[in-house]
Amino acid sequence: MAAAPSASGRRSMSWGSSISQSFRQAEADDPFGRAASQQGHDDDEENLRWAALEKLPTYDRMRRGVIRTALLHHDGGGDGGGAAAAAKDGRMELVDIQKLAAGNLGRALLDRVFQDDSERFLRRLRDRIDMVGIELPTIEVRYEQLSIQAEVFVGSRALPTLTNAATNVLQGLIGRFGSSNKRTINILQDVSGIIKPSRMTLLLGPPSSGKSTLMRALTGKLDKNLKVSGDITYCGHTFSEFYPERTSAYVSQYDLHNAEMTVRETLDFSGRCLGIGARYDMLAELARRERNAGIKPDPEIDAFMKATAVQGHKTNITTDVTLKALGLDICADIIIGDEMIRGISGGQKKRVTTGEMLTGPARALFMDEISTGLDSSSTFEIVKYIGHLVHVMNETVMISLLQPPPETYNLFDDIILLSEGYIVYHGPRENILEFFENAGFRCPERKGIADFLQEVTSKKDQQQYWYHDQERYRYVSVPEFAQRFKSFHVGQKMQKEMQIPYDKSSTHPAALTTTKYGLSSWESLRAVMSREWLLMKRNSFIYIFKVTQLIILAFMSMTVFLRTKMPSGTISDGTKFLGALTFSLITILFNGFAELQLTIKKLPVFYKHRDFLFFPAWTFGVANILLKVPVSLVEAAVWVVLTYYVMGFAPSAGRFFRQFIAFFVTHQMAMAMFRFLGAILKTMVVANTFGMFVLLIVFIFGGFLISRNDIKPWWIWGYWASPMMYSQQAISINEFLASRWAIPNTDATIDEPTVGKAILKSKGLITSDGGFWISIGALIGFLVVFNILYILALTYLSPGGSSNTIVSDEDSEDKTDMKTRNEQQMSQIVHNNGASNTSATSSIPMSGSRSTNQQSRSQIVLPFQPLSLCFNHVNYYVDMPTEMKEQGFTESRLQLLSDISGVFRPGVLTALVGVSGAGKTTLMDVLAGRKTSGVIEGDITLSGYPKKQETFARISGYCEQTDIHSPNVTVYESILYSAWLRLSSDVDTNTRKMFVDEVMSLVELDVLRNALVGLPGVSGLSTEQRKRLTIAVELVANPSVIFMDEPTSGLDARAAAIVMRTVRNTVNTGRTVVCTIHQPSIDIFESFDELLLLKRGGQVIYAGELGRHSHKLVEYFEAVPGVPKITEGYNPATWMLEVTSPIAEARLNVNFAEIYANSELYRKNQELIKELSTPPPGYQDLSFPTKYSQNFYSQCIANFWKQYRSYWKNPPYNAMRYLMTLLNGLVFGTVFWQKGTKISSQQDLFNLLGATYAATFFLGAANCITVQPVVSIERTVFYRERAAGMYSSLSYAFAQACVEVIYNILQGILYTIIIYAMIGYDWKADKFFYFMFFIVASFNYFTLFGMMLVACTPSAMLANILISFVLPLWNLFAGFLVVRPLIPIWWRWYYWANPVSWTIYGVVASQFGKNGDVLSVPGGSPTVVKQFLEDNLGMRHSFLGYVVLTHFGYIIVFFFIFGYAIKYFNFQKR
């Protein structure tokens, strides 16, 4: 490979990483291994086949392979059957590699060549490469004097309140005046180091130390707003010389995937897009050298390597390798899912995120917190496999782990310890303890080294590791550690290496990738089109629902505009036809509105793929554009076919098809417009608000609401810029230039020869037939422009959002003077056994107060009742999933828990442990009463009495695995709110607040007191901060029984230690605490008193005490014949999971569940359960006088307090609401400027009627749509809070409705003042206040209707689709497009049922119901305005009282339906 590489040859050549993301290692040997030197395993047939292969031209030879005949007839499935059959059948055949690369044949070959030993297989590959002297490309990554800074607001100025949002806008417009509290935060500070190939590096550090920032910097994925200095090079080359996004792979800690795709489909897509790199060129060179040297490789290894070099297929054998390596093969064909779609588990999603990057050809891997949600055994196997890639295939890998167990830690070669932006240590793992011992700190026995490293730099944890008895402890700061490292021998060696520049000429030509994408543009488009088509099929319900909705609307509209009621030939007849055409047009436009939400939903995954260079952004845009063309064809065809002849439009085939063309192009234009808006606005709340504003502008200047002749000169450009005007013009010309409208015009005021042209001219439309095609051309122009803008937005706009927490002023000061401050001491827990056997008290330890420095404060003592929880023979069943039925399962239900018995006692900390899928969370949900579906069998008692859920909710706490909190409140507000509603009403306000402060100090959230919670992965708190908040929210409830589902998952070792100290202290107060736990370190695991161990299938295999150093657990399992003894210092938790794994069970031929059921331990547990299932003498069943801790009034006040604060800190919702109100008012005011001062003609009155209709409908509709995402997010939080028994559903509904009413009143006042003055309505008090009332009332019922739809549907998306069905109906029967007297009698009831019609009635009747001005009527005699309203519109001033009452009625009805649905509809499936 000395020659200059081709374009493909310059790609990253990590064929090894894509070939073999391998299996967890078992103990089986590979009976099929072959030496590279051609020993005597070849038979004559194999030689003949190989000789035939060698005679083929190079191109054909690379696409053919020789494999055993048995594999060709194997059905795949990965069960090893193909390997076994192939071992018996030695016949060989020549096969097409294209067929081998995908499908069952490839999986059978995979089973055969791997044999569950990834290292051995990789070494066979490496031996083949080394035999012909090919050098694998390697990458060395250097970073020198790298510093990264961010400019951020700190303290209260950083909170996104409405005032801060307004201040930010003003500062952006007029510049900064005075201090803005924006400060420079150092994320990384002058760090340097070398990440070497063939060495696996572990990155450790506490939260906010800069780990993710360092990884993003090294992979070229930093936010452009950050200030960066220093150099980063790959093999001496800077980022400008290659593409770091493809040379390296960054595995993010956030799991962003398409929920509707399966695991296999997700990895197939990433593998297809990332390409094969230089794998094909390397393989061709390998084959050439082997041929010249007369070397014959193992045919099946050869076929396998060729299969991995096939590019562009929908699936590839490398996907199956990755699935096996990450343990995802068991869920390969299950959809990933999300919060609304049931899919794979959180740990499996994390592995999918890792697998996405492993399928590509990158040879430098940077993996950020890949173990979150995984048990320690799975983490060990995955890291071990990656270590094989590093050591055998010379890859470069850096991995950050939160809580690496010792056995995983020992797999790494180098350690980087990062803290406060400084590198404390970077060098070999063997020397790091020596470094800290030189500084005076030693890792204790039975303490994980990784845990020690993350705690030793912390002020609050450092002192416990000081071991110099002769010297007094002194806090060693992080900068001092960093300085000490520079003088340490490892640091000095690193500095010397950094001084020697890397020889760029020695860089392997395939090491750095110089092509931007893995596929050609055409192949990328095909791949994305295939993926988007798959997503459309998976979301087919949405498209079917939209068509069904369109059919219903078409039926309703064609019965309103029935041809028997639609005479033609006069100008007045034309008005009704214009109404029918306009309604059709509005329906088509509204139908395109759903594209807004569909686009925004796809953006997070798109941005990830775009930034990782999966494909060019334009391919995603073009794919979505092309795939929506059939949607427009179907929906336009459905509407036109159903309505055209029934409504009585011009009976001509040509005009029928021309209307279809107009509606098709309009629908395409609408979807393009909303796609573009979604791409630039990015969030549902902002996009919904602005989308409705754009729709309003398009509608106002569409040519129907106000004719061109009546538009003010300063707005005439808006008329020509409105796409709806061209649509209106096209369909109007198509209709009114038909022969039946060619009747001579008799109206002298309009100078046109025919009635049809007179109608067109009265609306300011073109009167020639050529205008139709001009309008179609203009619409196509809009369509093209919107699509181009959409693609440009996708290409150049950043994702937006921030995952940074707010830095408090105090925290900022702390970091400045940290060296000079003394450590604050944590006060000890105070135990109080209480005055009786059935009561106890708790107190919370306080850390030193900032304000008083080291002065301790008094502790709050709150009473609680110790309780034991017993469960006996518990079983849990769910309906058999559809996927399993399709695979042949015949049972009607699936058992998830099988005969589980146990007891949780006061003062005993119990660990609930098991591998993923063992049923830990399921059991906890069952015991806590959180299951919403399925069948539960068995006995559950609380201190001897049957558990009553309502009572149990009052005295229990549940820290869920997913941290669900209201995003727009602060940490302190979240905790105070929980305490307010869950502590007894006897606790006064001051005591409650002090208790909250103590809990916050206990879990170290006091520094984050005023930080916004935010949305996970988008804004606000980090994962570990959010986890601590979850625990604090439950602790302030002062519960007797606490369930914690993986409280340490997602936390680093130090944060996990903080949490476990908190948990231990809680148990010591006499509470009953049980925790599920995934990957505990030794010290965390041994902080538990008892263990309940589950195996897959929900069966108990151990329940009992751990004992000192876990000796009771170890003795129990070591007594089982064949179980290997635990080695000294090994983590008992890891050992326990390994020796009880399904593989170990199969090897020992035992069933640990049966062994436990027949053990003495089981009998003792049954005796204990029997004892505790009987109430103690004199003990009464737990009961409370009220269902909730607080009365209904207090619940309402607390809920309103939280909602008010949440709304105040939600500018994207409320600031946008008021901004759009202001813009709407100004637009209406200037378009209809002083139209209300003089009404002399029918057109004047209809202009005002149109203004009233549009002013009411569009802003109200915007409120209805934009409130839905807000309510949907809060509803998820509501489900958790309701399950905790915090409040009644009605108090929650009342509070949310009240806060909306307040904002709506202010919105209505602002809107009324603007448009009332600018339009020029009569300034009389009664008219003004009537107008204001109807506007405010309409905003309220629109908003409540949107809230009601969310409460009645499982998702905001479905509610949004329903809105697009209801709003056109309200629009149709509002009394504007068709006035009430002209509505067919069979639909007139809907006019009275339509709230919008009542609002228009109220506004028009209150403003003009007593108007005595003379009104000229075309074709009729003059009349007064009052009489015209009564005769033609059916509106009377005397009816206003009923109109007012009806508005109150709608508000009350919508509120009560919202409250009822919130209470009785539960769409959370658990």
From Swiss-Prot:
GO terms for cellular component: membrane. Its main location: membrane. The chain crosses the membrane at residues 541-561, 577-597, 629-649, 660-680, 686-706, 772-792, 1215-1234, 1249-1271, 1301-1321, 1331-1351, 1359-1379, 1389-1409, 1439-1459. GO terms for molecular function: ABC-type transporter activity; ATP binding; ATP hydrolysis activity. ATP 2 binds at G914, V915, S916, G917, A918, G919, K920, T921. Residues 832-843 have a biased composition (Low complexity). Keywords: ATP-binding, Membrane, Nucleotide-binding, Repeat, Transmembrane, Transmembrane helix, Transport. Residues 9-24 have a biased composition (Polar residues). Pfam families: ABC2_membrane, ABC2_membrane_7, ABC_tran, ABC_trans_N, PDR_assoc. ATP 1 binds at G205, P206, P207, S208, S209, G210, K211, S212. It is found in: Membrane. It is a multi-pass membrane protein. Coiled coil: none annotated. Residues 1-47, 828-852 are annotated as: Disordered. Residues 523-736, 1194-1408 form the ABC transmembrane type-2 domain. Residues 172-445, 869-1121 form the ABC transporter domain. Gene3D superfamilies: P-loop containing nucleotide triphosphate hydrolases. Belongs to the ABC transporter superfamily. ABCG family. PDR (TC 3.A.1.205) subfamily. May be a general defense protein. This is ABC transporter G family member 48. It comes from Oryza sativa subsp. japonica (Rice). The gene is ABCG48.
